[in-house]
């Protein structure tokens, strides 16, 4: 593998072309690959999106299980290998494109991927920032630190809170760096994402809820009653605390998704619209 790394030195590369530069680390453990596909629990009825297909170690197994496989890869050399490996699988389409520039399938789809670590958060935002999309579930291998941030009981990031209102996110297990080529500097984790059957809020409230989440989580370590006093009156906050069954010291980052649903519903029902916090506007092309 070292010889392969050497050939990229001093060479000008497009985004995602080299595993080392893109943060892409290819899996080579067959048992691990089979475990990932098994845990994804896919069937002939599923459309599977693979982001960062690499040389096709995962793609070829997915092609035998799914009804349709959309394998995205930006490295021209890998695309050639993928094309040869999947030539006998008519259900598999190779998409030669930057992951962040693709259009997600309009139909319901599943994601099974070993994603490039360098763009972990942008990929998650692409998949989860629109709860009305066709994304249903996924098994994603990512950097362990990112996996822990996305699944922590203490929530610091507004986008993570928004994701978890509509999706369950959990770590299946950790994966040693020795299962990858080139091996990353950090360990990895297998993460399961599942759309909630009974989400606490309708997806039509996503933008309004994101505004509340961004406002509240600017200071996740302070008490909720202090952070939200710009929205609720003292009397409203008193009733809200009773509804949430919390004391005055309960901090913003420790609330559950169901508690956030109560806060949001209370705001929309009893607070004048002009007092609702607004979500930050995204720049063109920003996720």
From Swiss-Prot:
S-adenosyl-L-methionine binds at residues 25, 27, 52, 73, 98, 114. Residues 1-21 are annotated as: Disordered. GO terms for molecular function: RNA binding; rRNA (adenine-N6,N6-)-dimethyltransferase activity. Its EC number is 2.1.1.-. One of its GO terms (biological process) is response to antibiotic. Keywords: Antibiotic resistance, Methyltransferase, RNA-binding, S-adenosyl-L-methionine, Transferase. InterPro entries: KsgA/Erm, rRNA_Ade_diMease-like_C, rRNA_Ade_Mease_Trfase_CS, rRNA_Ade_methylase_Trfase_N, SAM-dependent_MTases_sf. Belongs to the class I-like SAM-binding methyltransferase superfamily. rRNA adenine N(6)-methyltransferase family. This is rRNA adenine N-6-methyltransferase. The lineage of its organism: Bacteria, Bacillati, Bacillota, Bacilli, Bacillales.
